[in-house]
Design a protein with these regions (language model features):
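Catalytic strand-loop segment that frames the active site of acyl-thioester-processing enzymes
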Residues: 10-49, 54
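Short solvent-exposed loop/turn micro-motifs enriched in small/polar/acidic residues
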Residues: 11-12, 85, 110-112
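Hydrophobic beta-strand-centered segment that forms part of the acyl-chain substrate-binding groove
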Residues: 62-101, 126, 133-134
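HotDog/MaoC-like acyl-thioester-processing domains
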Residues: 92-143
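Active-site helix/loop of acyl-thioester processing domains in fatty-acid/polyketide metabolism
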Residues: 18, 49-73
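Short aromatic-glycine motifs in intrinsically disordered, low-complexity regions
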Residues: 1-9, 75
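Conserved positions in beta-strands of structured domains
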Residues: 16-19, 84, 89, 103-105, ...
Length: 143
């Protein structure tokens, strides 16, 4: 169901499952396995999920939240606009289940979504950030 909404595909699809979805929040998860391609180099012998990929996983779940507001999400792309106050508090390693929750900080207007994002693993906060994204119809995107 996630791939019906998001254009991302493995190995860059970083959301395994949506656990909760409302008009104002979303909770997603990603099981972190040793098979993740980035562990080959980050870091050999001591694998740690890169913080930027934790941010990306949260952004992808946020994309599901905002795309859920239109009847035809397959006709839209989500663009990351801004990230503020990102903090990386605890490492995410193979065997962890990363749970990420995004809550709207204000109502979605003109396809713009402003969210507070927090990721958890093993009962601890791993990452938090404020994010802003916008959905745009694919036929209006100039590449």
């Amino acid at each position: 169901a996630i791939m019906k909404v998001l254009p991302h595909r493995p190995p860059f699809l970083l959301v395994d499952k949506i656990l909760e979805l409302s008009d104002t929040h979303i909770v997603g998860m990603k099981s972190i396995t040793m098979n993740e391609p980035y562990f080959a180099g980050h870091f050999p012998g001591q694998p740690v999920m890169p913080g930027v990929l934790q941010i990306e996983a949260m952004a992808q779940a946020g994309g599901v939240l905002v795309l859920n507001t239109v009847p035809d999400p397959e006709n839209y792309l989500t663009f990351f606009m801004k990230i503020e106050n990102a903090k990386f508090k605890n490492p995410v390693v193979p065997g962890d289940t990363l749970i990420f929750k995004m809550e709207l900080l204000s109502p979605i207007r003109r396809g713009i979504c402003h969210m507070q994002a927090v990721a958890y693993s093993r009962g601890r906060v791993t990452t938090e950030a404020e994010m802003m994204a916008q959905i745009v119809r694919k036929d209006q995107v100039k590449v």
